[in-house]
């Protein structure tokens, strides 16, 4: 189902506020706020790739995805001899454990036999003319006179029997884009969620700094800025609260960014419990950020037809 949309040329559909643009022929999704653009696309074999997030832009940013034969980066079975197509090198919207992407995953599940992994592919989308809410969880909302919208993209692995709704909320005038994920068991057996990040954000270039805020009791929010180097950097809390020791908020900043100018991406987790944020720079200098509920010792049982709702993340550029 699609709500509040009208067809335009080149099979493009746009909502009445121009916040959500969908080109069905290219399978291209573009989210616009007053000053920013976020874009993703369904690519070969049904994978949902991340193309762009930053200052407002026009057009198709698919050119950012380049395919090379990287040694020891495997490819999906469907690709056969086309070794240049590897999930290990493609910027993705919601990465999975166990499908050939060896970077830090956003999502990991275990079946009743103890086998980890899944392979999420695109199924459908839905556009709603209001900002989504999350039952029992805090979320950004619109005030009187403000317009909010939602894009829901459904991914599925029918073999494992899991479905994931990726929720994108847009509050256009405030330049806010929010993210959440709803994991649903569509199988006849129990499934165990080992990790379900609220957001996964890939950057095709890696020349960034990480800004975060450490501390202790009575001395919270101490500023720290460091280069994002190769490997994985993790911050978070296992204390049952977001804690004095680390704030569930980070900034990915360009090397030359300061208080007056430069590229900065603020990511805030709207949750007061244990959390995890991980930033990885990979073998090809791409950067990935995942943020969500702390996955250390985490195992959430999903009975058939039940679901897990990941708390919301708010993003600004």
Whereabouts are the PLM-identified features?
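Short, Lys/Arg-enriched N-terminal segments with co-localized hydrophobic residues
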Residues: 2-17
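Contiguous, structured surface segment used for ligand recognition
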Residues: 41
């Amino acid at each position: 189902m699609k709500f509040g949309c009208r067809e335009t040329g080149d099979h493009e559909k746009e909502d009445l506020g121009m916040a959500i643009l969908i080109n069905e022929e290219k399978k291209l999704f573009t989210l616009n706020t007053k000053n920013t653009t976020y874009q993703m696309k369904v690519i070969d074999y049904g994978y949902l790739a991340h193309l762009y997030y930053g200052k407002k832009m026009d057009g198709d940013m698919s050119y950012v995805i380049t395919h090379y034969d990287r040694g020891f980066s495997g490819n999906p079975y469907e690709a056969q001899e086309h070794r240049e197509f590897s999930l290990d090198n493609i910027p993705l919207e919601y990465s999975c454990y166990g499908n050939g992407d060896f970077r830090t995953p956003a999502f990991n599940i275990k079946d009743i036999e103890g086998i980890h992994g899944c392979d999420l592919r695109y199924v459908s989308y839905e556009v709603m003319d209001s900002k989504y809410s999350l039952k029992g969880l805090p979320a950004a909302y619109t005030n009187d006179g403000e317009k909010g919208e939602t894009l829901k993209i459904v991914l599925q692995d029918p073999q494992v029997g899991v479905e994931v709704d990726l929720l994108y909320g847009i509050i256009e005038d405030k330049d806010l884009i929010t993210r959440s994920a709803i994991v649903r068991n569509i199988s006849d057996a129990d499934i165990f969620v080992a990790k379900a990040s609220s957001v996964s954000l890939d950057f095709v270039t890696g020349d960034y700094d990480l800004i975060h805020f450490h501390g202790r009791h009575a001395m919270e929010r101490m500023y720290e800025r460091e280069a994002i180097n190769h490997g994985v950097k993790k911050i978070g809390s296992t204390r049952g609260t977001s804690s004095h020791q680390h704030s569930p908020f980070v900034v990915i900043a360009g090397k030359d960014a300061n208080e007056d100018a430069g590229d900065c991406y603020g990511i805030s987790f709207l949750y007061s419990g244990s959390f995890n944020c991980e930033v990885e720079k990979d073998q090809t200098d791409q950067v990935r950020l995942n943020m969500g509920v702390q996955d250390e010792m985490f195992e959430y049982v999903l009975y058939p037809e039940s679901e897990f709702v990941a708390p919301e993340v708010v993003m600004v550029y």
